[in-house]
């Protein structure tokens, strides 16, 4: 099983629409670990995903649409070296 790590920047109407909580649920359901947080610009959510490549890709595909009420304009994906540093998926404070 190929493991992967992706660093995402999701832009649009993605704050105040339960994006972080919804992403946590989707990631956990797919066995993906990492974190998600709002950025202080008010229109970006940042996330780091780690897990089996297929599962990470599923979460990225979900992020392109997001939860009801979100309007995703862009998802920037930066593939990084897998580190295996997370035990679960967390919502972090705004940065």
Swiss-Prot record:
**In Gene Ontology terms, what is one molecular function of this protein?**
acylphosphatase activity
Q: Which Pfam families match?
A: Acylphosphatase (PF00708)
Coiled-coil intervals, chain numbering: none
EC assignment: the record states: 3.6.1.7
Keyword Hydrolase listed: yes
Active site per UniProt: 20, 38
Query: Which reaction is this enzyme known to catalyze?
Result: an acyl phosphate + H2O = a carboxylate + phosphate + H(+)
Recite the UniProt keywords alphabetically.
Answer: Hydrolase
EC top class, as a word: hydrolase
Query: Entry's InterPro entries?
Result: Acylphosphatase, Acylphosphatase-like_dom, Acylphosphatase-like_dom_sf, Acylphosphatase_CS
Domain Acylphosphatase-like: start-end pairs: 5-93
**PANTHER family found in the cross-reference section:** ACYLPHOSPHATASE
User: What does the sequence similarity comment in the record state about its family?
Assistant: Belongs to the acylphosphatase family.
Q: What is this protein called?
A: Acylphosphatase
